[in-house]
């Protein structure tokens, strides 16, 4: 069970906003792994209850020396996520903020970007072994640049 909502708004040609939200209520109807392990009613592992993305983009054409400047910021959120059938280990809802500035001149585009600008600490993946639970942390605050050529 679940639903999704999408929204897009363009107040002026150069400015765009979008928002997407999804809710999932995914549970095992019946799942008895053994006589002592009954996961019936538990949430499915690795299926987030909520997904969220919000995005804003502003584009300037013929901006001085550049043919185009694009400024973008976006928020992405996930959670609660259970990592195994027993629903013991979980990641609560978290959100990361990302941004990018793109400068285009002719066939070249130079991007300057930042990811997880809020430095959100989260678990990207977790798994269970006989020796315990193991987790991979999400990516920290990251900055970067790229140069691309379109022809």
Annotated model-derived regions:
Residues 1, 48-52, 93-97, 106, ...:
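Residues that define the transmembrane beta-barrel architecture of outer-membrane proteins
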Residues 25, 41-44, 91-93, 114, ...:
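Generic secondary-structure boundary/loop-capping signal
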Residues 76-84, 102-151:
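C-terminal beta-signal and adjacent terminal beta-strands/loops
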Residues 84-91, 97-100:
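Short, glycine/charged-rich beta-strand-loop motifs at protein surfaces that mediate ligand recognition
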């Amino acid at each position: 069970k679940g639903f999704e909502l999408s929204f897009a708004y363009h107040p002026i040609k150069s400015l765009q906003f979008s928002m997407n939200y999804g809710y999932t209520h995914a549970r095992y109807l019946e799942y008895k792994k053994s006589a002592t392990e009954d996961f019936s009613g538990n949430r499915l592992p690795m299926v987030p209850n909520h997904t969220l993305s919000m995005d804003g983009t502003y584009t300037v054409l013929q901006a001085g020396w550049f043919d185009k400047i694009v400024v973008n910021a976006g928020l992405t959120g996930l959670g609660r996520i259970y990592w195994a059938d027993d629903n013991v280990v979980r990641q609560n809802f978290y959100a990361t903020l990302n941004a990018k500035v793109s400068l285009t001149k002719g066939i070249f585009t130079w991007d300057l970007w930042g990811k997880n600008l809020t430095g959100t600490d989260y678990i990207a993946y977790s798994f269970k072994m006989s020796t315990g639970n193991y987790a991979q942390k999400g990516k920290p605050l990251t900055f970067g640049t790229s140069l691309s050529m379109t022809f």
